Amino acid sequence: MNTPTHALINWTVARSLGTESFPASAVLLGSVAPDIPLYFLSIGGGLWFRFVEGWEPGEVARHMFGTLFYKDPCWISLHNLLHSPLVLIVALVALYFGLGYAAFIKSWWGWFLGSCFLHTLVDIPVHHDDGPLLFWPLNWSYRYASPLSYWDMNHYAYIVMPVEGAIFLLLLGRIVWQRLRPNGS
């Protein structure tokens, strides 16, 4: 799923939990943080392979997303650190037991990790063979093979893309509507 859609989904879910006291920065950062390493790897790798190594753009894309994404330990680790359900569940459980319930539900880190986890849960069903590694770092290759993809036309992206676009527009419209209403709720 596209990163801006994650931000709108996570914001809407946080607002709908019935509390106005959630740390907005944690929710928003957690909604995009799982994708940030791949942005940096893609930009850095794209510039390096294109302008230092002199590769053609197609060659660069095939190498980065056909080889490095699936086989390079650095790429795998950085991309899955905040995308792995296993890592996020362990972190959330450890934080919960470390802080206790009352502090956990108000914790910036709890909201951040919860937002990363929601991002991951939304990603899993819309990535055919490039989704999060479910059991990383214990298993470095297992991904749920969804029949759907948000970008791959061979896996119904022609359906998923407009659905995601509609979700994005509806949630954005809802947020704008709430902000423009006199009472702001």
Predicted regions, residues:
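N-terminal membrane-targeting hydrophobic helices
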Residues: M1-S185
